[in-house]
Amino acid sequence: MKHKIFSHTSLLIILSVVLTFLAAGTVMYNRYDIYMKQGVRDEAAYIKTGLEEDGRDFLTDKIGDATSSRITLLGKDGDVLFDSIENPSEMENHSDRPEFIEAEKKGFGEMVRYSDTLSKQTFYYAIKLKDDQVLRVARTTDSLLMTMLSSFLLLGGLVCVIFVIEFFLVQNQ
């Protein structure tokens, strides 16, 4: 009888912990995603204002140290004029990038896709400037997902502790 109680209780505990973890993780990821994207949009608006008021002098090599985002300035034709991570002269034309095309048409564009340069899933936000250049701000999006995956070790430890407590409670009945 104790074995049956232990088995059923164990199954319920595992299901409860895993489902709670997945639900909380999903809610956290969605909120993080919303805040991260809005943060990138706000950052792009700030940099756009700086570029339109001060010109290209606003962008320096030190801007990469001031933000976790990648900043890229693209010419009308998609040529890279500035990049906070890579040497622009070694970069290919970006005129075929979805966020660039959308920014050219609508004034802004955004896309989540894999970055070959960063080797990570990245959120890109592009905004057209008054001089028809395009400012693109990008931030990797996998940080919370990686945190959740690394949390599975903690989850496993938590389940083990619960099993030990449950085992002693069932044995003492």
What do the PLM-derived regions correspond to, one by one?
Residues 1-80, 85-90, 146:
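Juxtamembrane segments flanking the first transmembrane helix
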Residues 4-8, 12, 150-158, 162:
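Alpha-helical transmembrane segments of integral membrane proteins
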Residues 21-29, 158-173:
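Cytosolic-side ends of inner-membrane transmembrane helices, especially those
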Residues 32, 92-95, 136, 173:
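Pocket-edge positions in alpha/beta enzyme catalytic cores
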Residues 36, 43, 144-151, 169-173:
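Juxtamembrane alpha-helical signal-transduction segment immediately C-terminal to a transmembrane helix
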Residues 49-52, 130-155:
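Helix-start (N-cap) segments at beta->loop->alpha junctions
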Residues 53, 90-131:
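Membrane-proximal, non-catalytic sensory/regulatory domains of signal-transducing membrane proteins
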Residues 69-81, 110, 122-141:
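Structured catalytic cores of enzymes that bind and process phosphorylated ligands/cofactors
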